[in-house]
């Protein structure tokens, strides 16, 4: 049986994992790069134990863009120092197989094992084939647990034993593993690579149909230097090193006297793409710069987020000089930066420790600055700083925004949630925990502007008296509220509206073509709470709808679809490969689009070759620019190569202006454009690209324009959520995608959302989309 659970932070998870191994069990501890460093003491300390135990496997997601973290630091140098083997999966299949292999290595060589998964794989999905289920018996509990102690003399002994036993064995393993892939092709030019960049290199090779020997490493610590030298000596021409991160492999080769072409000194490349690799190999890539700048889209908190009112209040206090410095943290609260309600951001749990240092250095600023942190991060590592403020008697104000869940990463539970991952009710009480640490605590409702203002005023007054106080602002994450509680409940009274645009702090409201604010399909109605925009409007221009006019997600009703009967078909009648990219704004349903296409590829028989899709994750999903890619058939990479896409889909019209996007389209293929406009609050309507700008950008391309949002609303969905399904229907009519029978498309849509009510709406949307071309 596999036991899965969330720990409060990565250091605790690593300790829990180590405890599992002492009980004889194999364990996988997952984290991103920041989590590695947060757990660094346990990671490094545990790396040198060399007695038999269960396998300790660290599954660590890198992010060399970065898109979801703040780190572009290459951790392989740390792994090398810790003498732990490192597996870098090249495909999704290898990523799935890696834990089993790691467990075998961990048990045999009595070592922790790192699976370093690249951001390119973690932010994509690919075809995998399931293996036979294997069961490993628990190892015997070590007779002498005293061996697992790190007294200085024992640490020395452990290090020496690792050098004598573990490392020679691991070096033999990496040099002789069949998982090193050497693809010979004439020896004129060679590429050494590892991880997901292997797929990118193959994409370039196949596109240009060039001779290229490839040595693809599966394990990068220890470095299989003998195999690398053998490969290097077999190449008559240049040898290239393509690796994400820093120059780890490149430096290892150069130390051995090999002359390779890799990254230049002070290179800014931390993550390769097929385009960058092609250019590195000497191929010319035609770039088509646009004269029109893309629309700036800073990520926003969700429409109706309980943090909205607090952000508005703090931004105003900052503007008026009542607050001079705001120290922020990691999580949804970081998005308050784009509301001018937060300034610094350093690391998980570090907001109040920054504030404390600032106040200790400038005691006169104790009542002029605040720190902000989320409840999940406070439980993760922020409470250490809370205790430090009490311990060191540092006056000031710490704000904990408590939405009960770890919202930014998907709504996982934390100790402050109602339940844990297993659904068990929790006894932890955040306010009592803070009080138990010796804090004075004030509580305010996140949907009550006046209460927030009053509470913050009181908190700053307490700070003026040289005391420390914690303000807890409480309101449930809007994503966790029941769907029936959501929907547009308000309207703009244009006679009262002065177009001050204070309400545009929420992504559920946008500037209309007439200049007046208007509610859009993202509006959640603050999930039945007192709406933030209503409270923020200084002119009372926002009013509740009459009962008869209320629009809710539950209002739509669709006829029952006919029963699906799949026709006979041959995969040989379909294109050898299909590739497309979808651009839009976070929240428009790109992820659903990709799921449908994946199901379609399975039904159409493309699983005999490969299916991959890539997606933007992280803060960009919160109203920022997002891109999804999909490929099936004879394909390798989740990142597309220029001139390879059979179609480009743009769910928000201006998003086609993003650099490099139009270059992805192959000659003669189609750009499918939604007429939807989402104007971010950081620009005016006049600054948004004109229709002439868009037309000029796509001049010379084959273009199909459709208003899928209007069509979705026309057929009965006032939320516009099925606009992406309308677009899928339109896509199904365009070549080469029209070679796949309509019934297969419909079955794919149904497979993703089979609930009768949802399927009925999606069926209507799909068929409506087909009628638009």
Where are the regions a protein language model picked out?
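Thiamine diphosphate
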Residues: 68, 335-472, 482-483
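A short, small-residue-rich loop immediately preceding and capping a beta-strand
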Residues: 2-5, 23-38, 53-60, 365-380, ...
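Anionic-ligand anchoring segments at beta-strand to alpha-helix junctions in alpha/beta enzyme folds, i.e.
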Residues: 1-8, 12, 22-25, 29-31, ...
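Flexible, low-complexity linker and terminal segments
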Residues: 94-301, 306-307, 446, 470-566
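Cofactor-binding active-site loop characterized by glycine-rich and histidine/acidic residues
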Residues: 287-394, 436, 554-574
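Active-site cofactor/cluster-binding pocket
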Residues: 35-38, 548, 555-773
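Conserved thiamine diphosphate
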Residues: 64-118, 145, 150, 154, ...
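Short acidic, glycine/serine/threonine-rich loops at helix termini
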Residues: 16-18, 39-43, 66-73, 97-101, ...
């Amino acid at each position: 049986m596999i036991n899965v659970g969330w720990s409060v932070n990565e250091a605790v998870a690593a300790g829990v994992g180590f405890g599992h191994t002492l009980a004889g069990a194999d364990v996988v501890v997952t984290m991103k790069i920041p989590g590695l460093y947060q757990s660094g003491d346990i990671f490094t300390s545990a790396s040198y134990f060399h007695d038999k135990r269960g396998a300790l496997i660290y599954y660590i997601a890198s992010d060399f863009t970065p898109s979801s973290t703040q780190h572009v630091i290459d951790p392989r140098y740390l792994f090398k120092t810790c003498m732990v083997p490192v597996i870098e999966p090249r495909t999704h299949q290898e990523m799935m197989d890696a834990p089993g292999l790691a467990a075998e290595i961990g048990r045999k060589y009595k070592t922790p094992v790192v699976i370093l998964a690249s951001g390119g794989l973690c932010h994509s999905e690919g075809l995998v084939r399931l293996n036979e289920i294997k069961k490993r018996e628990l190892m015997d509990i070590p007779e002498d647990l005293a061996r697992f102690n790190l007294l200085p003399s024992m640490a020395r002994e452990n290090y020496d034993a690792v050098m004598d036993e573990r490392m020679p064995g691991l070096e033999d393993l990496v040099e002789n593993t069949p998982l090193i892939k050497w693809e010979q092709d004439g020896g004129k030019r060679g590429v050494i690579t590892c991880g997901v960049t292997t797929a990118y290199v193959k994409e370039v090779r196949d596109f240009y149909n060039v001779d290229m020997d490839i040595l693809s490493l599966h394990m990068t610590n220890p470095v299989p230097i003998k195999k690398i030298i053998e490969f290097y000596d077999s190449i008559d021409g240049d040898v290239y090193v393509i690796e994400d991160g820093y120059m780890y492999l490149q430096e290892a080769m150069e130390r051995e006297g090999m002359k390779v072409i890799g990254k230049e000194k002070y290179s800014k490349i931390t993550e390769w793409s097929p385009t960058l690799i092609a250019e590195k190999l000497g191929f010319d890539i035609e770039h088509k710069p646009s004269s029109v700048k893309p629309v700036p889209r800073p990520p926003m908190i969700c429409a109706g987020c309980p943090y909205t009112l607090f952000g508005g209040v703090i931004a105003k206090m900052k503007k008026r000089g009542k607050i001079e410095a705001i120290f922020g943290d990691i999580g949804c609260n970081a998005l308050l930066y784009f509301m001018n309600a937060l300034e610094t951001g350093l690391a998980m749990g570090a907001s109040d420790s920054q504030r404390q240092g600032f106040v200790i250095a400038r005691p006169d600023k104790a009542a002029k600055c605040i720190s902000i942190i989320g409840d999940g991060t406070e439980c993760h590592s922020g409470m250490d700083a809370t205790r430090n403020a009490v311990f060191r008697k540092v006056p000031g104000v710490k704000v904990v925004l408590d939405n009960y869940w770890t919202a930014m990463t998907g709504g996982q539970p934390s100790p402050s949630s109602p339940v844990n991952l297993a659904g068990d009710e929790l006894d932890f009480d955040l306010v009592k925990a803070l009080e138990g640490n010796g804090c004075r605590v004030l509580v305010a409702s996140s949907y009550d502007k006046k209460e927030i203002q009053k509470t913050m005023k009181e908190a700053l007054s307490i700070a003026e008296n040289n005391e420390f106080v914690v303000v807890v602002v409480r309101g449930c994450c809007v994503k966790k509220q029941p769907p029936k509680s959501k929907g547009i409940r308000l309207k703009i009274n244009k006679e009262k509206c002065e177009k001050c645009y204070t309400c545009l702090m929420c992504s559920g409201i946008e500037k209309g073509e007439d200049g007046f604010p208007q509610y859009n399909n993202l509006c959640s109605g603050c999930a039945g709470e007192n709406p933030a925009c209503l409270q923020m409007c200084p002119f009372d221009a926002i009013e509740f709808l009459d009962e008869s006019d209320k629009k809710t997600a539950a209002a739509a009703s669709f006829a029952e679809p006919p029963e699906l009967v799949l026709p006979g078909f041959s995969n040989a009648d379909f294109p050898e490969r299909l590739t497309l990219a979808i651009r839009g704004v976070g929240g428009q349903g790109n992820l659903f689009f990709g799921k449908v296409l994946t199901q379609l590829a399975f039904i159409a028989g493309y699983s005999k070759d490969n299916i991959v899709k890539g997606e933007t994750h992280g803060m960009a999903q919160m109203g920022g620019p997002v891109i999804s890619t999909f490929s099936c058939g004879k394909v390798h990479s989740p990142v597309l190569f220029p001139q390879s896409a059979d179609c480009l889909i743009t769910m928000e019209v201006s998003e086609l202006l993003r650099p490099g996007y139009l270059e992805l389209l192959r000659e003669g293929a189609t750009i499918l454009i939604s007429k939807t406009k989402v104007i971010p609050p950081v620009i005016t309507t006049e600054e948004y690209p004109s229709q002439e700008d868009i037309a000029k950008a796509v001049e010379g391309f084959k273009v199909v324009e459709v208003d899928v949002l209007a069509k979705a609303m026309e057929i009965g969905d006032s939320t516009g959520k099925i606009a992406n399904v309308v677009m899928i229907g339109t896509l199904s009519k365009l070549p080469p995608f029209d070679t796949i029978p309509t019934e297969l498309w419909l079955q794919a849509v149904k497979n993703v959302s089979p609930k009768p009510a949802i399927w009925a709406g999606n069926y209507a949307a799909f068929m409506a989309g087909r009628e638009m071309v």
